[in-house]
Amino acid sequence: MNRKYLKITNKDGKVWLMPKQHMKTGLELYQPSSKKGRLLKRWLPWLYWLKPLMGKLGMSDIEYVMDPQIHHIIEKEFNQDAVEYSVFEGTPCVHQKTTIQIFKGENILGYCKVTKNPELYGIFQHEQKFLGWLKEQGVDQIPECPYCGQTEDGCFVFLQTTTKTLNSLVEHELGIKQLEFLSMLKVKTGMEMLYHESDQYQTICALKAHKELLKDTQRDRMNQATEIIDSYYGTKKHLFCAYHADFTPWNMFEDAGMLFVFDFEYGRYSYMPYLDMFHFLTQTAIFERELSSEQIYEEMLGRETELKELFVNPWMAYLIYLVDVIARFVVRDGHSRTSDVDKLISTWLELMELVMKRLKVE
């Protein structure tokens, strides 16, 4: 097994371990949001031997060996030997986990998520169940989970398949393929129900049960927003469908003309159709283009005609998305929120204010 690796550390403290052998394949795990990161991914296989340059870029040589128990599970489930790995040590947060790309030469076999956090293991089990349910509904272009379990030394392991190749593309603009995937979710998993019966409503209930996690002013504005949403839905039945909840370029790729979507660990069964598109648009604006809340709002204004083709009231839909994403992150991270998550929540709250003003105008 190859032991010679390159350790990559970015300015946010995120760490990747890349094998020097078949590095180009290993780098398929690395999904940078910045132009600098994308250039690094392109040229690293040819430049990593330049020691002075690597030092300036925050890289160093290390030796790395996969945990033998995890290695055994992977080889057994994928029915392969001499597999290779690249490793991402995770985004610093309450749900930090290690993600491993499994490959052999130029052939990517799948991915493995690892944690010692029992709460995260519950999320792994949810994702396995959710993927199985999506398959039963006829949703394709998603992974399968051949294994979700625990090693003897207490590591929780989640395996998933992939169709990714070296020719796969990551599209950073919301396009027809992304909308077609969301349309498929609506058609194949859509169901009529009362708002108060939906997963979407349960997320709001979870926030209300943890209202102490918000400042007084934030709590007041969230209460106003949830009242607006309650009034919008009323007592009639509405169509809800499956929701990815982290629908971003980093959780999908295109290959052979098809879009493949993964990382459904926060997936839910009953949300407003197409709501995922707001997460794609908002998060790429924040992370890739570093736009302010006002700039993101102006971009949404420019998309209003397009959004009206998918939503009866696009501004209400955007408010629903913003309230939901704030609620999920506040409840998920609790009192352990990092400064980066606090910054995100502040941006979403500012956007929520702008959207609520827009709704009053209309």
Question: Predicted regions span which residues?
Answer:
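Conserved short submotifs of the Hanks-type protein kinase catalytic core
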Residues: 154-165
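Active-site acidic catalytic loop and adjacent metal/ATP-binding pocket
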Residues: 97-102, 231-275
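Short beta-strand micro-motifs within the conserved protein kinase catalytic domain, predominantly
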Residues: 144-154
